[in-house]
Amino acid sequence: KEIASKDQVELVDGANAFHRGGLLRLGAVLTTTSAPLRTSPVKRGDWVLRRVLGPAIPPPPADAGSIPADEKLFGGLTLREKLAAHQRNATCAGCHSRIDPLGFPLEKYDAIGRSRDQYPDGKPIDDSGVLASQKRLSGVEGLLDYLKSEEKQVVRTLAQKLLGYALGRTILLSDQPLIDRLADAGGNASFSKLAAEIVAS
């Protein structure tokens, strides 16, 4: 076909061959979760934690410091090494141990979402993350497998986000029974089913 159908969404064959497919590999998500001149496993991991898994984490302390926006200012260290040095600060380590392992699996996508195998200086990219439970996530596929294993929490977060959007307000305690019902649908909860349940509630 030369022109895409206007009546339906069609699955694109072979998206995985180009390291594409799904929300986490979407260029817009990868770009907005990057620093201006480099990737940010912290921003990407925070996005996955807050938007996909759902738990809230506190903002960083005022004295947390920051990592330069340009990799050229890392003094020969890799981004992972720079973040490891940052985590030595005990006040930072607690949250970063939850955030960073979810962001590192997306490192093989640059600051504007292009697939890559090495950093601009030629160093190979380690796209693994190790969770606090010592579970290792190997690349984006490992991250996706982990999210599938956390399906109930992912569905609950999606239900909360959809309901908040539909109502145009923050979720209240009185909304929890509906969220529980939506989350209990588990693997049967498609996006359209969640939306229909919210509309009918």
Tell me the role of every PLM-derived stretch.
Residues 1-164, 176-191, 196-201:
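Active-site substrate-binding loop specific to GH73 endo-beta-N-acetylglucosaminidase modules
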Residues 166-170:
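Core structural elements
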